[in-house]
Amino acid sequence: MLDFNIEGLIPKNMEKRGELVLNEYLKEIEDVFNHRKIPENGIDDEKIKLFLKFLSMMDTDKDPKSVRIGEREARTYSKIHEELSSGFCHGIGRSGNLVDPQPKASGASIMYALTNKILESFFKQLGLNVHAIATPISTGMSISLCLSAARKKYGSNVVIYPYASHKSPIKAVSFVGMNMRLVETVLDGDRVYVPVEDIENAIKKEIELGNRPCVLSTLTFFPPRNSDDIVEIAKICENYDIPHIINGAYAIQNNYYLEKLKKAFKYRVDAVVSSSDKNLLTPIGGGLVYSTDAEFIKEISLSYPGRASATPVVNTLVSLLSMGSKNYLELVKNQKNSKKLLDELLNDLSKKTGGKFLDVESPIASCISVNSDPVEIAAKLYNLRVTGPRGIKKTDHFGNCYLGTYTHDYIVMNAAIGVRTEDIVNSVSKLEKILL
């Protein structure tokens, strides 16, 4: 692509040596274009910046001879705008399709297509052979896209929602103008879950009413709410031939969830939605949508109205290139060890306080019962500069996902991907000072 002549400027042996160094430096960038998969080892930031700069310079707003008379010409007032968008000021997509190439943005279009290819290779490394797109919107809005696609392709008009006290998916259903049928949770010891037979009964009732239901299940959520049994739900949805969308916000970071997804994909799963920030350590703002159904992924991309910001997609790409598969798997391993440490520390603390280390199902978060106002305890932790814990009263039907009275007041703490060991130790230490 580049053609410049340095012959005769320096001795031939030096010329060859210089070309060797340059080619070696650019090899990782060349591999991204040629192999279109996540690198095993991460690429350093300077090379990623060069890679992004190279692509962004292909967009028409960088053409010094371009005559720009449209209403949308990537005109920016400040250089900061260009920096924040990594130079992709035209964004991605066209008004009719998120993944369509944008004629004014050759570089951004290549960047987005590469991101999706690399994302698919990343999932393959994790054992999921899926089609995938990085979305420029977070989990809740990405769920809206999936529901909109289900309505268009299958005529779905009501969402069966096994109750989880998460405002984002609830608002996602409202946003696309679909009705919702909640399926209530039940209590089993310390755990809260939704029986699959109740989900099936809800599907039957909606079909009897002449509606076309789809199911929005929850794979990842705060305990004591269990993961939905997505494998059995997938079997039910296959049997009734109805769409099944899974909210797997932080499912990618732990093998416990990945194994469930592998099994569920054998049956009816139309799409899974995950968060880029919760799994790939990006700034908030992007989503990951994946499925074994390439046509449904296409339908989802068609549901996005208008052109989109490239920035959330660039953030996803940067994380994939910077981490590489080897470092990501190491982060996954560290997360598992961090959760083990959190469990041990909270279990020890519960014995000191006379509370209970709750028997819940989560590879990410843990719960400990408390004998005083949990909301006040969480507030004290915040004032001690600890962010993340949730304090839930047993009478808080929304917080504990249970419409009855839960067994305990409790605190939830997380050991998600990227957490530092010292943060786990310090947070439990500060909680101990509050409780004792």
Curated annotation (Swiss-Prot):
InterPro entries reported in the protein's UniProt record: PyrdxlP-dep_Trfase, PyrdxlP-dep_Trfase_major, Sec-tRNA_Se_transferase, SepSecS/SepCysS
Pathway membership, UniProt: Aminoacyl-tRNA biosynthesis; selenocysteinyl-tRNA(Sec) biosynthesis; selenocysteinyl-tRNA(Sec) from L-seryl-tRNA(Sec) (archaeal/eukaryal route): step 2/2
Chain positions recorded as pyridoxal 5'-phosphate binding sites: R72
PTM sites of type N6-(pyridoxal phosphate)lysine: K278
Consequence recorded when altering K278A: Loss of activity
Enzyme class (EC, first level): transferase
GO molecular function term, any single one: tRNA binding
Record region (Phosphate loop (P-loop)): 93-103
Result for mutant: R94A: Loss of activity
Result for mutant: R307A: Loss of activity
Keyword field contains Mitochondrion: no
Any Pfam family: SepSecS
UniProt-annotated site: May act as a substrate filter by repelling compounds with a negatively charged alpha-carboxylate, residues: E71
Residues reported in the UniProt entry to bind substrate: R94, S95, Q102, R307
Enzyme Commission code: 2.9.1.2
Catalytic activity: O-phospho-L-seryl-tRNA(Sec) + selenophosphate + H2O = L-selenocysteinyl-tRNA(Sec) + 2 phosphate
Cofactor annotation: pyridoxal 5'-phosphate
Sorted UniProt keywords: Protein biosynthesis, Pyridoxal phosphate, RNA-binding, Selenium, Transferase, tRNA-binding
Biological process annotations from GO: conversion of seryl-tRNAsec to selenocys-tRNAsec; selenocysteine incorporation
Function noted in UniProt: Converts O-phosphoseryl-tRNA(Sec) to selenocysteinyl-tRNA(Sec) required for selenoprotein biosynthesis.
Family note: Belongs to the SepSecS family.
NCBIfam families: selenium_SpcS
Protein name: O-phosphoseryl-tRNA(Sec) selenium transferase
Provenance organism: Methanococcus maripaludis (strain DSM 14266 / JCM 13030 / NBRC 101832 / S2 / LL)
